[in-house]
């Protein structure tokens, strides 16, 4: 496991937007340095209320952010030109996370571009693998075969984009869903249809101390996914 407080950025031109939401207080005051048994119990905990985490990530011991479901409006601001691209940031409970991601691909159209992201090799840093012009139905069929990897590997992320328009859906290594779109309504309807409520004060797990997890099997499966997609 490795600790991180950085947002995932599967595509170069679309980093996860930053929220101005006021921080929430942790549910408990916890000591700064837990003993081994207490830390093991914390890492084994996969559910907070009704929110189910996947194996990919855990909140830090201090619970800076308590995981919960919902989505918020946000925006990516181009640091060079100052232009704004509307965004949605969603935290989805594990039992419906993958199907929600797949549903969000529908508004992207019949053909998509794909960026896979890997942080498996710490020495190599963040690596990206791209595929342009894949049929969305073919992409979806392949992704269903790798559901376990994309849900449970804390070192894998994917971004799916419209080849011409500013439309992008990210499923990042924090297992958050991020949508970039000039018109958010079609994607927002999908999120509401999945039972998610809008809360613009929502803080997500990547905004606090957290830990990612991966293993050799996931790394091998990531390579298989890149091969199936024809990424380079």
PLM features per residue range, with description:
Residues 2-176, 180-232:
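Structured alpha/beta or helical-core interaction and ligand-binding surfaces enriched in interleaved
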